Amino acid sequence: MLDQDTVKILADLSLTMFNKNFFGIYHGAISTKQDEYSFMINTRDAIFDRMDEKSFCSLNINKQDYRWNIASMESDIHATIYANIHEAKYIAFGMPIYTTAYTLNHNKIVLEDFFGKTTFGEISIYN
């Protein structure tokens, strides 16, 4: 059984990220570590602006079972991060929907924090 408070937190965060164009309808993944051996992640058919308990599943970090078939396609990546970075509690993977269009008219992508105060680096765009 999934913790309802955790589902609410992830659903609210998912809606915010969806509204800011970090998640598309079916693009992205969001998860939280439940304990040392398990984590909760969205299902592969989750709609990020309408998440509820049915939009998530609980997975074992070390062992794949039938639940991995309905989980997000990024589940392996999340499991690896949780297994190797023990302090990790939440992971969100998103790709802004206009990134590809942006690359058509620009030579680089500048990575900034949410408030735009810190620059994390640049990615050159090659044709």
What is the meaning of each model-derived region?
Residues 1-127:
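Glycine-rich flexible loops
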